[in-house]
Amino acid sequence: MQIQFHLYNTLSRTKEVFNPQDQANVKMYVCGPTVYYNPHIGNSRSGVVYDLLYRIVIKIFGEKAVKYVRNITDVDDKIIDRAALLGVTIDELTDKVTKEFHKNMAYLGCMLPSIEPKATKHIDVMIAIIERLIAKDHAYIADNHVYFDVLSAPNYTELSNRNLEEMFEGVHVENSKTKKNPQDFVLWKPAKQNESANMNFESPWGLGRPGWHIECSAMSYKYLGENFDIHGGGADLIFPHHTNEIAQSRCAFPSSTYAKYWVHNGFLTVNGEKMSKSLGNFITVRDLMDKQIQGEVVRLFLLSSHYRRPLDYNDKAIEDAKKTLDYWYRAIENINVQKIDLPHDFMQSLLDDMNTPLAVKIINDYAKGVFISKTEEERQLNASAIITCANFIGLMNKTPHEWFNSGVDELYINELVNKRLEAKKQKNWLLADQIRNQLLEEKIILEDQPDGTTIWRKE
């Protein structure tokens, strides 16, 4: 029987059965980072959501049938400004932040995309598309800029489902006097005086650089063609970025529908507030890594809420994710687990618009099953279901021993445990208690065994 994957499409505002244009060549594009600042936890939500989507599509159609493109935006005004602020070159900044992004994705257990193109390597494709738009009267030159004529695009507001006036209400419009319409957006902008040479490129309109929106249209076209299946990104990209992508791509290639399914993940707040540097609640993934919060904990937190709903980062949410993973790892401890077929109810939860809260509940139910099982066979079956389901969503990639002792200096702890055992032999109870309390402060729990040995675990 054909698997049916129901996915919410922002374009139609309904859940649809995912039906790719070619089941042997499923195409997926996701907007990646602008590499001017270390990625924050909001960026990480997008990374994890589309990693899960990629895993599901691979499960249905096979790894060889799926092409996942996630771009790197390495040309942008923000990059120029931050490089100047830090006193480094553009290349130094973008290389450093790109490497950090890759470390963050690995920390969160994300698979590599099939292709990760950089905007600066595709300027020729951008120029070619802009030339097509000018030739078709969808773009024009004004004051050394090239602008897209928004009013020339059919169904410009289709994705956002708002009228034009509402969409631009309160939006700062640059160079409005030189444009045909205030809403027109830039496709190409001229170089400014004293700007870094490696952030500007030769073009038919002089030295300059592309606008943000044309970059994704060019890279998706280069690797996926005029039409592809899935386009993903954060809900904040619906307007203007994705709206403008659709407009320029469909106008450049009139027979194109561009992306068939538009998928958007919800916003992430911190303690109920929007994340911002001014509020002092701007949290990067590196901050979490430096706190030695395990990547699986952050990943489970990000999957604990439905991807389209808002998600709030707070200490309790992270603590709850850690407790849940502790529970799962404890459930499979000392059991010979086997990889089994994905349980039907678990897979159905993910096929229903990636219902991860239900998927997590199902894993919890299997963990409960381990502890109430009456036979070893039943325990093994439940434990095997836990590891199979968790692995599929990118979790539980360690042994229980590795998990509970992660970040622990085992040699140091074993030395103290042996020192305490020696103190007990000599009936130096004061020293033995001091060592126990010292380890307890470091969240190491000692368990004295009937045979006189001591085992330890991380709290």
Swiss-Prot record:
Question: Which EC class is this protein assigned?
Answer: ligase
Please indicate if the UniProt record lists Ligase as a keyword.
yes
- Family of the protein in this entry: Belongs to the class-I aminoacyl-tRNA synthetase family.
Q: Does the keyword Aminoacyl-tRNA synthetase apply?
A: yes
Organism lineage reads as: Bacteria, Pseudomonadati, Pseudomonadota, Alphaproteobacteria, Rickettsiales
Q: Name one GO cellular component term.
A: cytosol
Q: EC number(s) of the enzyme?
A: 6.1.1.16
Q: What is this protein called?
A: Cysteine--tRNA ligase
Picking any one GO biological process from the record gives: cysteinyl-tRNA aminoacylation
Please report the organism this UniProt entry assigns to the protein: Rickettsia peacockii (strain Rustic)
